[in-house]
Amino acid sequence: MGSATVLDSILEGVRADVAAREAVVSLAEVKARAERAPAPLDVMAALRAPGIAVIAEVKRASPSRGELASIADPAELASAYESGGARAISVLTEQRRFNGSLDDLDAVRAAVSIPVLRKDFIVRPYQIHEARAHGADLLLLIVAALEQPALESLLERTESLGMTALVEVHTEEEADRALQAGASLIGVNARNLKTLEVDRDCFARIAPGLPTNVIKIAESGVRGTADLLAYAGAGADGVLVGEGLVTSGDPRSAVADLVTAGTHPSCPKPAR
Protein backbone atom coordinates (compact mmCIF):
# COMPACT_ATOMS: atom_id res chain seq x y z
CA MET A 1 0.00 0.00 0.00
CA GLY A 2 3.05 2.32 0.01
CA SER A 3 4.39 3.99 3.12
CA ALA A 4 1.64 5.30 5.38
CA THR A 5 2.19 8.76 6.83
CA VAL A 6 1.70 9.72 10.47
CA LEU A 7 -1.54 11.40 9.43
CA ASP A 8 -2.76 8.22 7.69
CA SER A 9 -2.15 6.25 10.87
CA ILE A 10 -3.99 8.81 13.03
CA LEU A 11 -6.96 8.89 10.65
CA GLU A 12 -7.24 5.10 10.64
CA GLY A 13 -7.56 5.15 14.43
CA VAL A 14 -10.00 8.06 14.38
CA ARG A 15 -12.33 6.28 11.95
CA ALA A 16 -12.35 3.18 14.14
CA ASP A 17 -13.03 5.25 17.27
CA VAL A 18 -15.88 7.18 15.62
CA ALA A 19 -17.49 3.92 14.47
CA ALA A 20 -17.22 2.54 18.02
CA ARG A 21 -18.85 5.65 19.52
CA GLU A 22 -21.61 5.66 16.91
CA ALA A 23 -22.38 2.03 17.78
CA VAL A 24 -23.15 3.23 21.33
CA VAL A 25 -24.76 6.62 20.60
CA SER A 26 -26.52 6.80 17.23
CA LEU A 27 -26.23 9.73 14.82
CA ALA A 28 -29.91 10.51 15.46
CA GLU A 29 -29.28 10.69 19.22
CA VAL A 30 -26.17 12.86 18.81
CA LYS A 31 -28.14 15.21 16.54
CA ALA A 32 -30.88 15.46 19.18
CA ARG A 33 -28.31 16.24 21.89
CA ALA A 34 -26.72 18.89 19.65
CA GLU A 35 -30.09 20.59 19.20
CA ARG A 36 -30.56 20.73 22.98
CA ALA A 37 -27.13 22.29 23.61
CA PRO A 38 -26.89 26.02 24.43
CA ALA A 39 -26.37 28.17 21.32
CA PRO A 40 -22.76 28.50 20.16
CA LEU A 41 -20.80 31.66 21.01
CA ASP A 42 -19.72 34.22 18.38
CA VAL A 43 -16.18 33.08 17.70
CA MET A 44 -15.35 35.60 14.98
CA ALA A 45 -16.25 38.56 17.19
CA ALA A 46 -13.96 37.21 19.91
CA LEU A 47 -11.09 36.75 17.46
CA ARG A 48 -11.57 40.13 15.79
CA ALA A 49 -11.27 42.10 19.05
CA PRO A 50 -8.17 44.37 19.22
CA GLY A 51 -4.78 42.74 19.69
CA ILE A 52 -3.41 39.32 18.78
CA ALA A 53 -5.84 36.65 19.97
CA VAL A 54 -4.41 33.81 22.05
CA ILE A 55 -6.16 30.44 21.70
CA ALA A 56 -4.85 28.36 24.61
CA GLU A 57 -4.87 24.59 24.35
CA VAL A 58 -5.56 21.77 26.79
CA LYS A 59 -3.01 19.30 25.46
CA ARG A 60 -1.84 16.20 27.31
CA ALA A 61 0.33 14.61 24.62
CA SER A 62 1.35 14.79 20.97
CA PRO A 63 2.66 12.33 18.36
CA SER A 64 5.94 14.27 18.11
CA ARG A 65 6.70 14.65 21.82
CA GLY A 66 4.71 11.93 23.59
CA GLU A 67 3.31 12.90 26.98
CA LEU A 68 3.61 16.64 27.63
CA ALA A 69 1.74 17.17 30.87
CA SER A 70 -0.31 15.29 33.40
CA ILE A 71 -3.48 17.39 33.47
CA ALA A 72 -5.49 16.19 36.44
CA ASP A 73 -8.12 18.90 36.06
CA PRO A 74 -8.69 20.30 32.55
CA ALA A 75 -11.37 22.66 33.90
CA GLU A 76 -8.86 24.24 36.28
CA LEU A 77 -6.32 24.64 33.47
CA ALA A 78 -8.92 26.20 31.16
CA SER A 79 -10.00 28.61 33.90
CA ALA A 80 -6.37 29.65 34.36
CA TYR A 81 -6.11 30.27 30.62
CA GLU A 82 -9.30 32.33 30.67
CA SER A 83 -8.14 34.44 33.61
CA GLY A 84 -4.83 34.98 31.79
CA GLY A 85 -6.72 36.57 28.92
CA ALA A 86 -7.13 33.77 26.36
CA ARG A 87 -9.82 34.53 23.76
CA ALA A 88 -10.71 30.87 23.27
CA ILE A 89 -9.78 27.44 24.62
CA SER A 90 -8.75 24.56 22.36
CA VAL A 91 -9.38 21.04 23.67
CA LEU A 92 -7.77 17.97 22.10
CA THR A 93 -10.32 15.16 21.94
CA GLU A 94 -8.33 12.61 19.91
CA GLN A 95 -7.57 9.74 22.28
CA ARG A 96 -4.83 7.57 20.76
CA ARG A 97 -2.01 10.02 20.04
CA PHE A 98 -3.09 13.07 22.06
CA ASN A 99 -4.65 11.38 25.13
CA GLY A 100 -7.66 13.65 24.73
CA SER A 101 -11.35 12.94 25.27
CA LEU A 102 -14.84 14.34 25.01
CA ASP A 103 -14.85 14.31 28.82
CA ASP A 104 -12.12 16.97 28.69
CA LEU A 105 -14.31 19.01 26.33
CA ASP A 106 -17.29 18.72 28.70
CA ALA A 107 -15.18 19.78 31.69
CA VAL A 108 -13.74 22.81 29.90
CA ARG A 109 -17.08 23.91 28.47
CA ALA A 110 -18.61 23.90 31.96
CA ALA A 111 -15.69 25.91 33.38
CA VAL A 112 -15.29 28.84 30.96
CA SER A 113 -17.48 31.44 29.28
CA ILE A 114 -15.27 32.03 26.22
CA PRO A 115 -15.45 30.03 22.96
CA VAL A 116 -14.24 26.42 23.01
CA LEU A 117 -12.62 24.65 20.05
CA ARG A 118 -12.88 20.90 19.54
CA LYS A 119 -9.44 19.96 18.19
CA ASP A 120 -9.59 16.59 16.52
CA PHE A 121 -9.36 14.91 13.14
CA ILE A 122 -12.88 15.49 11.82
CA VAL A 123 -13.70 13.12 8.97
CA ARG A 124 -17.39 12.34 9.49
CA PRO A 125 -20.56 14.43 9.96
CA TYR A 126 -21.12 12.46 13.19
CA GLN A 127 -18.16 14.24 14.81
CA ILE A 128 -19.60 17.67 13.98
CA HIS A 129 -22.93 16.97 15.70
CA GLU A 130 -20.94 15.38 18.53
CA ALA A 131 -18.86 18.56 18.93
CA ARG A 132 -22.01 20.67 19.17
CA ALA A 133 -23.63 18.21 21.59
CA HIS A 134 -20.61 18.63 23.87
CA GLY A 135 -20.75 22.43 23.72
CA ALA A 136 -18.08 23.29 21.15
CA ASP A 137 -18.36 26.68 19.45
CA LEU A 138 -15.79 25.91 16.80
CA LEU A 139 -13.98 22.86 15.48
CA LEU A 140 -10.91 22.03 13.45
CA LEU A 141 -11.08 20.86 9.84
CA ILE A 142 -7.69 19.74 8.48
CA VAL A 143 -7.36 20.16 4.72
CA ALA A 144 -4.64 17.48 4.46
CA ALA A 145 -7.04 14.94 5.98
CA LEU A 146 -9.95 15.60 3.62
CA GLU A 147 -10.75 15.38 -0.07
CA GLN A 148 -12.24 18.62 -1.40
CA PRO A 149 -15.92 17.49 -1.52
CA ALA A 150 -15.68 16.24 2.09
CA LEU A 151 -14.00 19.47 3.22
CA GLU A 152 -16.75 21.54 1.64
CA SER A 153 -19.63 19.46 3.01
CA LEU A 154 -18.15 19.28 6.53
CA LEU A 155 -17.56 23.05 6.55
CA GLU A 156 -21.12 23.65 5.40
CA ARG A 157 -22.49 21.32 8.08
CA THR A 158 -20.40 23.01 10.79
CA GLU A 159 -21.78 26.42 9.86
CA SER A 160 -25.34 25.08 9.55
CA LEU A 161 -25.16 24.24 13.28
CA GLY A 162 -24.03 27.79 14.09
CA MET A 163 -20.45 26.76 14.76
CA THR A 164 -17.27 28.13 13.17
CA ALA A 165 -14.66 26.01 11.40
CA LEU A 166 -10.96 26.65 11.92
CA VAL A 167 -9.63 25.27 8.63
CA GLU A 168 -6.03 24.11 8.98
CA VAL A 169 -3.48 24.31 6.16
CA HIS A 170 0.25 23.67 5.78
CA THR A 171 0.90 24.58 2.12
CA GLU A 172 -0.17 27.23 -0.39
CA GLU A 173 -2.15 24.59 -2.28
CA GLU A 174 -4.05 23.64 0.89
CA ALA A 175 -4.70 27.35 1.56
CA ASP A 176 -6.22 27.67 -1.91
CA ARG A 177 -8.44 24.67 -1.18
CA ALA A 178 -9.53 26.19 2.14
CA LEU A 179 -10.52 29.43 0.40
CA GLN A 180 -12.30 27.53 -2.36
CA ALA A 181 -14.31 25.71 0.33
CA GLY A 182 -15.38 29.07 1.79
CA ALA A 183 -13.22 29.18 4.94
CA SER A 184 -13.31 32.49 6.83
CA LEU A 185 -10.98 31.34 9.64
CA ILE A 186 -7.73 29.70 8.54
CA GLY A 187 -5.04 28.20 10.75
CA VAL A 188 -1.56 27.74 9.32
CA ASN A 189 0.15 24.82 11.05
CA ALA A 190 3.94 25.00 10.96
CA ARG A 191 3.99 21.24 11.59
CA ASN A 192 3.58 18.88 8.66
CA LEU A 193 1.13 16.24 9.92
CA LYS A 194 2.44 13.68 7.44
CA THR A 195 6.05 13.84 8.67
CA LEU A 196 5.74 15.83 11.97
CA GLU A 197 8.52 18.17 10.78
CA VAL A 198 8.18 21.86 11.68
CA ASP A 199 8.68 24.65 9.14
CA ARG A 200 8.61 27.96 11.01
CA ASP A 201 8.55 29.99 7.78
CA CYS A 202 5.32 28.31 6.70
CA PHE A 203 3.03 31.07 8.04
CA ALA A 204 5.06 33.92 6.53
CA ARG A 205 4.94 32.15 3.16
CA ILE A 206 1.19 31.44 3.15
CA ALA A 207 -0.35 34.45 4.94
CA PRO A 208 0.30 37.05 2.18
CA GLY A 209 -1.85 34.99 -0.21
CA LEU A 210 -4.89 35.05 2.12
CA PRO A 211 -7.54 37.80 1.79
CA THR A 212 -7.59 40.45 4.53
CA ASN A 213 -11.14 39.48 5.55
CA VAL A 214 -9.97 35.95 6.46
CA ILE A 215 -8.86 35.61 10.09
CA LYS A 216 -5.40 34.04 10.17
CA ILE A 217 -4.23 31.91 13.09
CA ALA A 218 -0.63 30.73 13.48
CA GLU A 219 -0.44 27.20 14.91
CA SER A 220 2.63 25.44 16.34
CA GLY A 221 5.95 26.93 17.30
CA VAL A 222 4.89 29.60 19.82
CA ARG A 223 7.23 29.18 22.79
CA GLY A 224 7.08 32.76 24.05
CA THR A 225 6.40 36.41 23.25
CA ALA A 226 9.12 36.65 20.57
CA ASP A 227 7.35 33.98 18.51
CA LEU A 228 3.98 35.71 18.93
CA LEU A 229 5.46 39.03 17.78
CA ALA A 230 7.12 37.37 14.79
CA TYR A 231 3.82 35.80 13.74
CA ALA A 232 2.04 39.15 14.27
CA GLY A 233 4.61 40.79 12.02
CA ALA A 234 3.87 38.18 9.35
CA GLY A 235 0.15 39.00 9.47
CA ALA A 236 -1.34 36.73 12.14
CA ASP A 237 -4.60 37.74 13.81
CA GLY A 238 -4.03 35.15 16.51
CA VAL A 239 -1.91 32.25 17.71
CA LEU A 240 -2.86 28.80 18.95
CA VAL A 241 -0.55 27.66 21.76
CA GLY A 242 -0.52 24.29 23.50
CA GLU A 243 2.82 22.73 24.35
CA GLY A 244 4.41 26.03 25.43
CA LEU A 245 1.63 26.58 27.97
CA VAL A 246 1.09 23.11 29.45
CA THR A 247 4.85 22.74 30.04
CA SER A 248 5.30 26.28 31.43
CA GLY A 249 4.67 25.55 35.12
CA ASP A 250 2.41 28.61 35.38
CA PRO A 251 -0.16 28.51 32.57
CA ARG A 252 -2.06 31.64 33.64
CA SER A 253 1.10 33.76 33.64
CA ALA A 254 2.31 32.21 30.38
CA VAL A 255 -0.97 33.17 28.67
CA ALA A 256 -0.95 36.62 30.29
CA ASP A 257 2.57 37.28 28.96
CA LEU A 258 1.45 36.43 25.42
CA VAL A 259 -1.74 38.51 25.74
CA THR A 260 0.23 41.50 27.05
CA ALA A 261 2.68 41.26 24.14
CA GLY A 262 -0.17 40.88 21.66
CA THR A 263 -1.96 44.01 22.88
CA HIS A 264 1.15 46.18 23.35
CA PRO A 265 1.25 49.33 21.16
CA SER A 266 4.49 48.09 19.56
CA CYS A 267 2.88 44.81 18.44
CA PRO A 268 2.22 44.72 14.67
CA LYS A 269 -1.50 45.13 13.92
CA PRO A 270 -3.46 42.67 11.78
CA ALA A 271 -4.41 44.05 8.35
CA ARG A 272 -8.18 43.97 8.39
From Swiss-Prot:
<keyword id="KW-0456">Lyase</keyword>
<dbReference type="InterPro" id="IPR013785">
    <property type="entry name" value="Aldolase_TIM"/>
</dbReference>
<dbReference type="GO" id="GO:0004640">
    <property type="term" value="F:phosphoribosylanthranilate isomerase activity"/>
</dbReference>
<comment type="pathway">
    <text>Amino-acid biosynthesis; L-tryptophan biosynthesis; L-tryptophan from chorismate: step 4/5.</text>
</comment>
<dbReference type="Pfam" id="PF00218">
    <property type="entry name" value="IGPS"/>
</dbReference>
<keyword id="KW-0028">Amino-acid biosynthesis</keyword>
<protein>
    <recommendedName>
        <fullName>Indole-3-glycerol phosphate synthase</fullName>
        <ecNumber>4.1.1.48</ecNumber>
    </recommendedName>
</protein>
<keyword id="KW-0822">Tryptophan biosynthesis</keyword>
<dbReference type="InterPro" id="IPR013798">
    <property type="entry name" value="Indole-3-glycerol_P_synth_dom"/>
</dbReference>
<dbReference type="InterPro" id="IPR045186">
    <property type="entry name" value="Indole-3-glycerol_P_synth"/>
</dbReference>
<keyword id="KW-0210">Decarboxylase</keyword>
<dbReference type="GO" id="GO:0004425">
    <property type="term" value="F:indole-3-glycerol-phosphate synthase activity"/>
</dbReference>
<dbReference type="InterPro" id="IPR001468">
    <property type="entry name" value="Indole-3-GlycerolPSynthase_CS"/>
</dbReference>
<comment type="similarity">
    <text>Belongs to the TrpC family.</text>
</comment>
<keyword id="KW-0057">Aromatic amino acid biosynthesis</keyword>
<dbReference type="GO" id="GO:0000162">
    <property type="term" value="P:L-tryptophan biosynthetic process"/>
</dbReference>
<dbReference type="InterPro" id="IPR011060">
    <property type="entry name" value="RibuloseP-bd_barrel"/>
</dbReference>
